[in-house]
Amino acid sequence: SKQAHITASKLMDYNVDYALINRKMFDVKSKGRLKVEQYLSSSMEYYLDDRCAMITITQEIIDKSGMEAAEFEGIASLTLQVEGVEVGVTVKQREENVYKISMRSSNYVDVSALCQKFGGGGHIKAAGCQINGTLDEVKKKLVNAANQAIEEAK
């Protein structure tokens, strides 16, 4: 936001190592986080002529990673790092047959409206919801909804 940039510029008047802060916030990741990102990147699924990318984080993946659940925050943006992807979907298991969905849009698709169909919401380019069902059922619902949203946005 505008205010965040104003505040950041004021901090530069003090002897703050903003380059170090930036590096620690955006560039440095734990080995566990990098391993998880590597695994998720290699297992990413593509739908709708590669316009939709989906990663799935099961409880098994969380357990094997040794990471805390909070360390998975921000992983949703991984799906938008692929050229041509318009809708990125992260499906994270909360418990058996309960999934937290995070969606990101790279361009014109309103993922907030998409998530509202499942009782969620958010912003045009970042939104979320929760869907109950088997993993296959959840993925099918998401791909169908993403397809509709992409077609409507054209």
Outline where the language-model segments fall.
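Hydrophobic helix-and-loop "lid/oligomerization" segment in the mid-to-C-terminal part
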Residues: 1-117, 122-154
